[in-house]
């Protein structure tokens, strides 16, 4: 008799995705981040649900309701800090997951890759709206600055901004709708994750060599369930150390001041995970140009399959492109640092140079390096 996991319509789907899934035997720990992102999403949905039970999305009470959660609700402080730092862990895993995809040429699985880009945009939108909810100074001014960027769109821009605000400034209408969207988006993200996995399981996982691994596959369980569990333990350990010992290290002190439309903070900046894109936005003097560069900084990932010139898939045996890749990583760290600095000399020029380097490496240098390597290895 066939065991239930292979027969039952519902369990059969889980079986094909997480138990009997044929997996390349040589995938490294860089392949752990998919499951860790799933864990982060679950943590965020659960903590967010409990926060939503006590939060009020009205400008007069939003800040006080967050203070009430931290002071009066049982373990409210823990739930709040888990949710805030959970977002940071989510983005750390996201960036490493995308970085892994770029390094090992996973972008050649085009449907999975494009679905991943849509997911990245959705998660970024969710995080941005979540940052507005505590209604501190940085929440209010961050929302004002970022939504105002839409006014750069010709003809309809101003109308669009006022439509999103629900008035002539960021106010209760804006906060209420941001809360509604922030609540619903994680569930949409969960659905998109299932589509992401559906596309992935059509082609099967990539592996560190970038070669076809059909001849050497093993079941996902128990080998990779155990391996993923180690990743889960490490993530939870780092997460709890961050949450319990350094809960505010990644936040902005300005957000402990209630929102005040009459008082602008000296340096308006988003959360750390948006700083690289914020630096690219600020490095262009023109408003519309900055907005386009901001969108392109993420959307450029969609061009990666077209910019792949090498006959090899992964970077593991491609030292020139490897060098370009690590320069790109360093460049992103520089952009992150610049995004948090005031707009003055020398930060402006460093930001502009780093922004040019970011696009140049992806669009020009890495494809050229791929062609050079083909010639060196006589692969043409």
Curated annotation (Swiss-Prot):
What residues bind a ubiquinone, as annotated?
201
Instruction: Select a single GO molecular function from the record's annotations and give it.
Output: metal ion binding
Q: Where in the cell is it found?
A: Mitochondrion inner membrane
Q: Which UniProt keywords apply?
A: Electron transport, Heme, Iron, Membrane, Metal-binding, Mitochondrion, Mitochondrion inner membrane, Respiratory chain, Transmembrane, Transmembrane helix, Transport, Ubiquinone
Sequence positions that bind heme b b562? 83, 182
Gene Ontology biological process = mitochondrial electron transport, ubiquinol to cytochrome c
Binding, heme b b566:
97, 196
Looking at the UniProt entry, the stretches that span the membrane are: 33-53, 77-98, 113-133, 178-198, 226-246, 288-308, 320-340, 347-367
Q: Per its UniProt record, what SUPFAM superfamilies does this chain match?
A: a domain/subunit of cytochrome bc1 complex (Ubiquinol-cytochrome c reductase), Transmembrane di-heme cytochromes
Query: Does the keyword section mention Mitochondrion?
Result: yes
Q: Which Pfam families does the record associate with it?
A: Cytochrom_B_C, Cytochrome_B
Q: What topology does the record note for this protein and the membrane?
A: Multi-pass membrane protein
Q: Which GO terms describe its cellular component?
A: mitochondrial inner membrane; respiratory chain complex III
Q: How is the cofactor bound?
A: Binds 2 heme b groups non-covalently.
Instruction: Determine the domain of life of the protein's source.
Output: Eukaryota
Needs which cofactor?
A: heme b
Q: Which family does it belong to?
A: Belongs to the cytochrome b family.
Cite the record's note on assembly.
The cytochrome bc1 complex contains 11 subunits: 3 respiratory subunits (MT-CYB, CYC1 and UQCRFS1), 2 core proteins (UQCRC1 and UQCRC2) and 6 low-molecular weight proteins (UQCRH/QCR6, UQCRB/QCR7, UQCRQ/QCR8, UQCR10/QCR9, UQCR11/QCR10 and a cleavage product of UQCRFS1). This cytochrome bc1 complex then forms a dimer.
Q: Which PANTHER family match?
A: CYTOCHROME B
What further note is attached to this protein's record?
Answer: Heme 1 (or BL or b562) is low-potential and absorbs at about 562 nm, and heme 2 (or BH or b566) is high-potential and absorbs at about 566 nm.
Summarize the protein's role. Component of the ubiquinol-cytochrome c reductase complex (complex III or cytochrome b-c1 complex) that is part of the mitochondrial respiratory chain. The b-c1 complex mediates electron transfer from ubiquinol to cytochrome c. Contributes to the generation of a proton gradient across the mitochondrial membrane that is then used for ATP synthesis.
What is the recorded name of this protein?
Answer: Cytochrome b
**Species for this entry:** Microtus longicaudus
């Amino acid at each position: 008799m066939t065991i239930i996991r292979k027969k039952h319509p519902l369990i059969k789907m889980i079986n094909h995705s997480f138990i009997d899934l044929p997996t390349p035997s040589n995938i490294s720990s860089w392949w752990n981040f998919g499951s860790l992102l799933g864990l982060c999403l679950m943590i965020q949905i659960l903590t967010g649900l409990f926060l939503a039970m006590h939060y009020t999305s009205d400008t007069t009470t939003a800040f006080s309701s967050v203070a009430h959660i931290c002071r009066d609700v049982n373990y409210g402080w823990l739930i709040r800090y888990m949710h805030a730092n959970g977002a940071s862990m989510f983005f750390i895993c996201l960036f490493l997951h995308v970085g892994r995809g770029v390094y090992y040429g996973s972008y050649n699985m085009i449907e999975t890759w494009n679905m991943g880009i849509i997911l990245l945009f959705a998660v970024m939108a969710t995080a941005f709206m979540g940052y507005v909810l505590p209604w501190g100074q940085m929440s209010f001014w961050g929302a004002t600055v970022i939504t105002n960027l839409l006014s750069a769109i010709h003809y309809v821009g101003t109308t669009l901004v006022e439509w999103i605000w629900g008035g002539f400034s960021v106010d209760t209408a804006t906060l209420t709708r941001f809360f509604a969207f922030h609540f619903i988006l994680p569930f949409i993200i969960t659905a998109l994750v299932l589509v992401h996995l559906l596309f992935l399981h059509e082609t099967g996982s990539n592996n560190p060599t970038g070669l076809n691994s059909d001849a050497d596959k093993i079941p996902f369980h128990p080998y990779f369930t155990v391996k993923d569990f180690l990743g889960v333990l490490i993530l939870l350990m780092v997460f709890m150390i961050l949450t319990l010992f350094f809960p505010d290290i990644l936040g902005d002190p300005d957000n402990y001041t209630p929102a005040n439309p009459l008082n602008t903070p000296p340096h308006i900046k988003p959360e750390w995970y948006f700083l690289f894109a914020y630096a690219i936005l600020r490095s262009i003097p023109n408003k519309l140009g900055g907005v386009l560069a901001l969108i392109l900084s993420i959307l450029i990932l969609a061009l990666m399959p077209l910019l792949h010139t090498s006959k090899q898939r992964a970077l593991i045996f491609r030292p020139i492109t490897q060098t370009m890749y690590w320069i790109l990583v360093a460049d992103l760290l520089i952009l992150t640092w610049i995004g948090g600095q005031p707009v003055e000399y020398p930060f402006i020029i460093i930001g502009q140079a780093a922004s040019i380097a970011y696009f140049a490496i992806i669009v020009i240098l890495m494809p050229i390096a791929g062609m050079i390597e083909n010639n060196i290895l006589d692969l043409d």
